[in-house]
Every structure is written in C-alpha cells, then in structure tokens.
Amino acid sequence: MLLLIHCLQSAAKLNLTLRVTGKRGDGYHELRSLFYELPSIESLTIEPDYGHNVKDTIFVTGETIRGRNILEDVLATARKKMDVFPLRIRLHKVVPPGSGLGAGSGNAAALISWLNTARDENEKLGGEEAGSDVPFFLKAGKWAFVGGRGERVEPLVEPMPRFFSVVVVPSWGMSTARAFSLLSAKYGSSFPMDEEDAEKERLLVLEKLKDNLTYGLLPNDFFTVLLKEHPEYEDLF
C-alpha cells in the first residue's frame, strides 16, 4: 500500500502592539493588535494510519507539551464536519508553550490548512474553534491588524517594511488563561485604552516601522502584570 507522507511548515507570530480594551459577553476579551508572522520554524509530518489503529497518534519532539495538544482539538472538530482517517503526526516543536508567540496556533493552522485541501466550502474549518490566534495564520500574510478575540483579521497588503527581529524566550511560560486572569485582577473592567485609541496606536506603530523610525518599547498590556510575576523580565529592557 502506498503511504503518502505530508510535511508541513508551521509559523509563529509577534504582537507588535497588544491592547485589551474590554471583556465581552461570551467571556472572551476584546483585543486590538498588530501581528507580524515569524518565519516557519516548526514542522508537522502527517501520514494516514491505515493499520489497526482507530485513534490518532501524535509524537512531539523538541519542546514538551503538557496537557492536551491543540492538534487533538483540531481533529476532534474536523471529524464533526468531514471524514478523516486516523493519522500519525510527528510535531517538531522549537518554541516553548506559553511563550506568547502563538506557535501552538501555528501548528493548528497548518493542520487545518491541510485538512481543508480539496474540501467543499461547507466542510472547511475556519479555525476560531481551535484558538484565538489561529485565524491570523489562516487568513493573513505577514502583517495584519487583528481585533475581536482574534477572529477579525485585516491583512495588510500594501508594501510593508523589511522586518528583522531577535526573539528572546525566557525559561518560564504562562498560559493564556493565567495571563488574562492577572490582567483582569489588575484592571477589572476598566482597561488602559479604548478601541479607538488602540487602533490609532497600532497605526502609529506601523507607520513608524514603515519609515524606519524608532518607536521605543512596543505597547503591550501584559507587560506590567508579567513584570510583577517575573521581575527578571525587566532585564530584557
């Protein structure tokens, strides 16, 4: 039997701005952000498992994932809309979970894109169910304005600056739920910036980057709460 092995690249991202402007009725927070996609630095190898297995097998190398893998959630959601053989997936992780770079969402988006190949529109997955950052990886190019809880993606297709970055990842990580819990404890329902000002701010950051101008410390509402939890964070700045 011929087995087709599919090798997929998986990206991560940077939040060049990240403002939380309120809490929604569905429990999620309202965001305004400028996203930049980092080069593909992780990979998935996928092959159908036509043997006796009735479950998927996911092998992870590189970094350790504790708890449920987001790829399991993608496959569970996919099978509600489409037929999917049991799969054998090898995921090579480079970015530690809880780093805020969205690498797990990048993994999910890579798998969703593969699952959506040659599917009818009514079968395709949108990505919102898997995670708030997933729509960006599915809909955008390198740059995008992102709003809502992450589902509203406005790709920026005009000529964009060449962007080089040095990404420093600390030895500790923090779950998204924990980070938002700390933020809510600090601000309650009154966050530092409203939606209009957050949109103006991200546009200003983008314009300065396009003009090769220095902006300074990029705005991120999580900075102060993370600094309180991990004072060594300040050494980076």
Go through each PLM region and give its residues.
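Short amphipathic alpha-helical segments and helix-helix/interface helices
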Residues: R32-F35, K124-G127, F237
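Charged catalytic carboxylate motif
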Residues: I70, N107, E232
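DPxDG-like acidic metal-binding loop motif
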Residues: S99-K124, E128, F136-A140
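Gly/Ser/Thr-rich beta-alpha loop segments that engage phosphate groups in nucleotides
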Residues: R24, H29, G100-A108, R149-G150
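Conserved, helical-rich catalytic subdomain that frames metal- and/or nucleotide-binding sites
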Residues: K55-D56, K139-A140, A144-F237
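ATP-binding N-lobe of GHMP and related small-molecule kinases
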Residues: L2-S99, N116-D120, E158-M160, V169-W172
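Residues at the starts of beta-strands that form the adenosine-phosphate
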Residues: S43, K124, F164
